[in-house]
Regions:
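Glycoside hydrolase catalytic-domain context in secreted enzymes
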Residues: 1-537, 541, 545-555, 559-560, ...
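Short beta-strand elements
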Residues: 562-584
């Protein structure tokens, strides 16, 4: 419609600045266009009446005009009420009914204390030549690096937080008793005050750093006189929707940004490559082929300058991604390196404490630091891979959905199960690599100011389990904590089921152990947890878990590479779990994804010492970019405008009751079993419109449904703490999940959940969009700050404990992003993610599996992901959301999409028919419309509503029975405005009429 287009073009600049997409704006206008036209018609009528009234007598003329104006205002007020309590109710009420959030001081204090504890146990000492802790004689420090004045406290997007009250690096050093060189600090703050923004729509990858000319002789002479010790801070981070560039030269020269036009038919919607960079000098900061995770030329110049003037140099790497750090060994003056990811509100206090020795570092790496990222097995199979032969399909989708990003991407998980340390340990054992040439710092690595001796004791094979103890003795001179890391090695047959040479199976963090003292940790390992998944049918037709016969090794290691103690046991014959399942399974695990997710790429295999490494991990061949007819046909079935939900309909399904008057309220179901008969009675009370609203209005909320007494509730981000941009409720800035994971402390993860959960309670917000537990498949993933580790077991246990902590407060966590959402590029552009089922289950579902099976709360939720698993969207994947999540793992609760931007494939009908219950949007897209009123479709809606209602009913919202009802803030506001407006209009109308009558009477008397 011409009017709709005009209004969209007129209002887009204003609403886009508020974060409202053009697609959403278009949808809102389409909903309201009838009302807008009515108001315009009324305006025209009013104007006509006023013009015609000119012919009336002078006094009566004014009465007519005033009456017309008053009538117009009154009718518009009625229409505004109808709009706000009709089509826009959930959008308006979510804002107006939001409560003013004031966190209790006790809550904030607890959060800040917990965050500092996380950093004290999570910062990793990567190198120490004896320089740390600093001598008590050192009172002053020269702090170099622009990042020292603008450190990274967390991430962006859903992983962002309010860092306005956060303690920075310089303040932490001062709090630790050091003075810092203010001349250096002033030079950096004068150079640039603000950090460049890395956002979803546009990224500024600039690394501000003064060129070497700024380090004048007088400045450096002053610095040397000030102190003989230098601290250098280097920072890096990505962002939501923004993977880190692998070729910074292309960002600098602009060719990177031009890729949007090459791969997208809607380049304005395609933001992944809209990056820019401003050089610090009259030269390029990066040379051709250098990545964002390498030092810039200006940073190298700064390090050259510092190391030429100081013999005592401490480097602080303030990064959320594992950088290339081989340059550390090129400077003999660098005596210590501390890895300090985004530290949240108070985490940097730990930095000063580690430097002065009041805290003994005990953090361990959660990723493998490699010397050359271009030599990693994933390097050629990530990022901007787009199909080249589907232009017609892309044009068709763009015509149907204005939110479509215009591209179709793919990613092959060609490295298979060999992610991170699992590749390097196995490749070293097979002789493919020389370990020391490739790995700078292993997974699970971290130094301490003391030394520990530990070994496996009392090892016993109990049949289904093995049990043992590990005694950790502090053999050094200061108290400290240590991490006990347990790995297993399974027997591998050449050409058989893929197996890594080292696999983390258990871990524990000790208490602080005094010198000469010890602590014992006891372990029970289930043998079934060492089973491999046979997706290729090597031993199990149809796929399944199998514990193969042979010798197994349980090893105690100080990191993934260094074995301290080991024990062995033997499995006499293969144990096939594809028939009866593992003890933790609700149903047997068999192949679910292999038919459509495996793809036809060469997968890395350990066979013959990784003989196919070059082919599997090389640049994809040209035909990989050509979508096959079979793949296209499968994709088209899931495309908005082509998708036909009636294919799911079953004529034998019976239409359930709707709109019944059973007298139940949602509060009556709190605490009742999921299968309780009263649930059907409650669901019978829902109308078709109730169900459509409850399903579609899930944007940072769940909708009010009066027919069952369900209140409107708030959900919000995120992994870094309370961050509700709708209600303006912001909590304490929690650190990145990388720093949390580096503690290797499950009890502390639980404490994080408890303290963060209390902030949600204070905000009356019990839905938490977190934690996130995707895998650090690559170092370049823009959202690694939001995920724990490259290892699925570490991720799963940390997540489970954090979730359980939050659940004690009545918070229902949305573990996300389910699943294989391991890169940002093309995430909403039909990102077809191909992997073997073994890879999917062992590498990428396992964290979610452990968190689900280990959850101890009453209410839990899941957020599905943007990407596709093979040719099926994750948000509408029956095998993922029903067969695996609910069937195998026993999950009970609701599943919500990631942000429902439509994107050409997020279709409500498709989602609810395949296990996704709630749309994270505002019922604003054409793809949200639920029009199929068949029994099958209504049953799917009913099931989705049950999952939503069950989750909310068992959360903190309903912990004390029926939540307080009565008049909402929105209703109070509207009643007040309506009453005031009515009184004003009546008074004005009365005055007009009285004055007219008075003048008329005077005229008669005259």
């Amino acid at each position: 419609m011409i009017m709709t287009g005009f209004l969209v073009n007129l209002l887009s600049p204003v609403f886009s600045s508020l974060g409202v997409s053009q697609a959403d704006l278009t949808s809102y206008i389409e909903k309201l266009i009838g009302y807008v036209i009515a108001i315009l018609v009324l305006l025209v009528v009013m104007i006509v009446v006023m013009v015609v009234a000119h012919k009336a007598k002078k006094g009566f003329r004014h009465v007519i005009r005033w009456q017309a104006a008053i009538a117009f205002i009154a009718i518009v007020a009625v229409l505004v009420n109808v709009i706000c309590y009709g089509p826009m109710y959930n959008n308006v009420s979510s804002v107006l009914n939001a409560k003013k959030v004031v966190l209790a001081q006790e809550t904030t204090d607890q959060s800040r204390a917990t965050i500092q504890k996380v950093a004290e146990e999570g910062m990793v000492l990567l190198k120490n030549d004896g320089i740390l802790p600093l001598s008590s004689d050192t009172k002053k420090l020269n702090v170099f690096g622009w990042d020292s004045t603008n450190p990274l406290f967390g991430g962006t997007g859903s992983g962002s937080s309010d860092s306005s009250t956060a303690i920075g690096i310089l303040q932490s050093l001062k709090d630790a008793g050091y003075e810092t060189n203010e001349s250096l600090t002033k030079m950096y703050t004068d150079y640039r005050a603000d950090r460049p923004t890395i956002a979803m729509a546009q990224q500024d990858w600039t690394l501000p750093e003064p060129t070497k000319e700024y380090y004048t002789d007088s400045l450096m002479d002053e610095a040397k006189e000030y102190s003989d010790t230098a601290v250098v801070v280097i920072g890096r981070s990505g962002g939501e929707g923004a993977d880190l560039p692998t070729d910074m030269k292309s960002v600098i020269d602009g060719s990177y940004a031009k890729k949007a036009e090459e791969v997208s038919v809607s380049p304005d919607n395609y933001g992944y490559v809209k990056g820019s960079y401003t050089n610090n000098g009259d030269y390029d900061d990066f040379d051709e082929g250098e990545s964002y995770l390498e030092l810039s030329n200006t940073e190298e110049d700064m390090l050259d300058t510092v190391c030429s003037q100081f013999d005592n140099v401490i480097v602080v790497v303030n990064a959320n991604n594992a950088m290339e750090l081989d340059w550390v060994d090129k400077y003999e003056q660098i005596g210590a390196v501390i890895f300090a990811p985004g530290a949240g509100a108070t985490g940097f206090e730990a930095l000063g404490e580690i430097i002065n020795g009041s805290v003994n570092p005990s953090g361990k790496t959660v990723d493998t630091f490699v010397k050359d990222l271009t030599e990693t097995p994933y390097y050629n199979n990530m990022g901007l891979n787009a199909y080249t032969n589907v232009e017609d399909l892309k044009e068709q989708i763009a015509a149907n959905d204005p939110a479509y990003e215009g591209s179709m991407g793919f990613v092959n998980y060609a490295e298979g199960i060999y992610v991170g340390y699992k590749f390097y340990e196995t490749a070293a054992e097979e002789g493919l690599i020389k370990y020391e040439d490739m790995v700078q710092y292993p997974f699970g690595y971290g130094l301490s100011y003391t030394t520990f001796d530990k070994q496996i004791e009392n090892f016993k094979d109990n049949g289904d389990t093995v049990t043992f103890d590990v005694t950790v003795e502090n053999t050094g001179s200061v108290a400290g904590k240590d991490v006990v890391e347990i790995y297993y090695t399974a027997p591998y047959t050449n050409g058989g089921i893929e197996k890594a040479a080292a696999n983390l199976i258990a871990f524990e963090k000790t208490d602080s152990i005094e010198p000469g003292e010890s602590q014992t940790k006891s372990f029970t390992i289930n043998k079934e947890d060492m089973a491999s998944y046979d997706s290729e049918g090597i031993k199990i037709s149809g796929g399944g878990y199998i514990l193969e016969a042979g010798e197994y090794t349980i090893s105690l290691r100080s990191d993934s590479h260094t074995v301290l103690s080991e024990e062995k046991f033997t499995v006499d014959e293969d144990i096939d779990y594809s028939k009866d399942g593992r003890s933790s399974d609700k149903t047997v695990a068999t192949n679910q994804f292999e038919d459509y997710a495996r793809g036809d790429f060469e997968q890395l295999s350990r066979e013959d010492g990784f003989a196919n490494y070059d082919k599997a991990c090389g640049v994809p061949e040209e035909d990989a970019y050509v979508m096959s007819d079979e793949t296209r046909a499968a994709v088209e079935e899931n495309v908005f405008g082509i998708y036909d939900g009636t294919k799911y309909n079953n004529d034998s399904d019976e239409m359930p009751a709707m709109g019944a008057d059973n007298g139940l309220q949602l509060a009556d179901l709190t605490g009742k079993d999921y299968d309780d008969a009263d649930w059907d009675k409650l669901l019978d009370q829902l109308s078709f419109e109730d169900m459509a609203t409850l399903i579609n209005v899930g944007g940072w909320q769940t909708a009010e449904i009066k027919s069952v007494g369900k209140i409107a509730t708030s959900d919000c981000d995120g992994p870094a703490g309370l961050n509700n941009f709708i209600t303006k409720a912001y909590g304490t800035a929690y650190p990145s999940e990388v720093l949390m994971a580096q503690t290797w402390n499950k009890e502390l993860a639980n404490e994080i959940g408890v303290s963060m959960g209390q902030e949600y309670v204070d905000a009356d917000n019990y839905g938490w969009y977190g934690p996130a537990m995707n895998i650090h498949r690559t170092a370049f993933a823009g959202r690694n700050f939001e995920y724990y580790s490259e290892d699925s077991l570490l991720s799963g246990y940390m997540a489970a404990n954090e979730m359980n902590g939050a659940a004690t407060k009545g918070v229902y966590p949305y573990m996300k992003h389910f699943a294989l959402n391991d890169q940002e590029t093309n995430r909403c552009s039909f990102l077809l993610t191909f992997a073997s089922e073994q890879t999917i289950r062992e590498g990428y579902l396992k964290a979610f599996e452990l968190a689900t099976k280990g959850f101890e709360g009453k209410a839990m939720a899941v957020m599905s992901s943007f990407n596709w698993i093979g040719t099926v969207p994750s948000c509408a994947n029956n095998e993922l959301l029903n067969n695996v999540l609910r069937g195998e793992w026993g999950f009970v609760g609701m599943v919500e999409t990631d942000y429902d931007g439509s994107y050409g494939y997020m279709i409500t009908d498709h989602c609810i028919r395949n296990g996704n219950d709630l749309m994270l949007g505002f019922n604003s897209a054409e793809s949200n419309k639920l029009t199929d009123e068949s029994a099958t479709a209504v049953l799917a809606m009913r099931q989705a509503c049950k999952n939503i209602l069950y989750t909310v009913a068992n959360s903190g919202y309903y912990a004390d029975g029926n939540p307080a009802s009565g008049m909402t803030n929105m209703t109070k506001l509207f009643v007040m405005i309506d009453v005031i407006l009515a009184v004003v209009l009546i008074v004005v109308d009365t005055i007009v009429i009285v004055r007219w009558r008075k003048k008329k009477k005077q005229a008669v008397n005259e």
